[in-house]
């Protein structure tokens, strides 16, 4: 029937249930496509320098998705491409995922540890996503974290960047310390702090340049490039990188492995809540009774003592009362009575 009609006429003759089904199915595919495009994988650029035998921390934050089965790590070198870790399946000796939750429900941390690093670990590491049905994954040549490994017999590098803090916990309003030690000189160029990774990262402190007012440098020594973050809030949560830049050509020369900052809201204790829930000038009737009960009892005790003393005085003998109360006139009458007896 619809084959001989135009598209609008055909749709007009369809039952309402088919029209509803068409409306549901078409946006469904579009929304699924947009949700896949909303994914964003954030990882530091590097290069990072690690000594042979140490542990390498590779950070990766996926924004907009928390599906473990669709994320994996791939190492690309001049020789080949190798899968380092797959969150969906497989056994990878020496590689462990970082178990860490984020404050945002759709932001997930897919960072990994590589233990006992060797020279074979030199290369560029990509945190990539795949569709879950095939092993095809998308990688871009300008992304990934490059890693350099110093062997036991290699000469000392001209620069080391050490960020010893993997995780820092703070409370709203606190001042947080982010540690960075730079050993060596390297090429001429500044040291900068960044929050985040990829194109969305933000420069927060530039030694010798313009910086945010809430960040201050510590600089306890010439090698100390640590900073203080004052009055932190939930917006300050994230990963911070201490990075060395080369002035000519203007490029990133070396990066630290990053420090993750988590900020929690300041909580009020139960005792503080009791004191702050009611004004200090108000008091319940029970409280008034507790305060005034000792005072009332004290007044009753004093009154009772006074009554007992008055009662004891009124019951004294008449002779004692005459002697005690005799005045000058009474003394003369007593003297006259004694003379008459003589």
Curated annotation (Swiss-Prot):
Residue numbers on the Extracellular membrane side: 33-287
Keywords: Disulfide bond, Glycoprotein, Immunoglobulin domain, Membrane, Repeat, Signal, Transmembrane, Transmembrane helix
Cytoplasmic compartment spans: 309-342
One Pfam family hit: V-set
SMART domains noted in UniProt: IG, IGc2
Signal peptide start-end: 1-32
Name of the protein in question: Signal-regulatory protein beta-2
Gene designation per UniProt: SIRPB2
């Amino acid at each position: 029937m619809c084959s001989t009609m135009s598209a609008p006429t055909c749709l007009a003759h369809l039952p309402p249930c088919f029209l509803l089904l068409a409306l549901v199915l078409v946006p469904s595919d579009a929304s699924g496509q947009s949700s896949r495009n909303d994914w964003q994988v954030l990882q530091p650029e590097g290069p990072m320098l690690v000594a042979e035998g140490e542990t390498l921390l590779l950070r990766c934050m996926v924004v907009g998705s928390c599906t473990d089965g669709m994320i994996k790590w791939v190492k690309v070198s001049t020789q080949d491409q190798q899968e380092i870790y797959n969150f969906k399946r497989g056994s990878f000796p020496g590689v462990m995922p970082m178990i860490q939750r984020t404050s945002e429900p759709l932001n997930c941390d897919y960072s990994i540890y590589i233990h006992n690093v060797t020279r074979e670990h030199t290369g560029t590491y990509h945190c990539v996503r795949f569709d879950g049905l095939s092993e095809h994954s998308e990688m871009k040549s300008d992304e990934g974290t490059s890693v350099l490994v110093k062997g036991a017999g290699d000469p000392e590098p001209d620069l080391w960047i050490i960020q010893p803090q993997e995780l820092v916990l703070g409370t709203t309003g606190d001042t947080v310390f982010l540690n960075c030690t730079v050993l060596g000189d390297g090429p001429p160029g500044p040291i900068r702090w960044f929050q985040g990774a990829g194109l969305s990262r933000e420069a927060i402190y530039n030694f010798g340049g313009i910086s945010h007012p809430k960040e201050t440098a510590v600089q306890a020594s010439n090698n100390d490039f640590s900073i203080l973050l004052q009055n932190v809030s939930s917006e300050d949560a994230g990963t911070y990188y201490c990075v060395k830049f080369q002035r000519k050509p203007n490029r990133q020369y070396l990066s630290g492995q990053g420090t993750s900052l988590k900020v929690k809201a300041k909580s009020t204790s139960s005792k503080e809540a009791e004191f702050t829930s009611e004004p200090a000038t108000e008091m319940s009737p029970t409280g008034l009774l507790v305060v005034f009960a000792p005072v009332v009892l004290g007044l009753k005790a004093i009154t009772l003592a006074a009554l007992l003393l008055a009662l004891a005085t009124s019951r004294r003998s008449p002779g004692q009362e005459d002697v005690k109360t005799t005045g000058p006139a009474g003394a003369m009458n007593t003297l006259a009575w004694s003379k008459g007896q003589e």
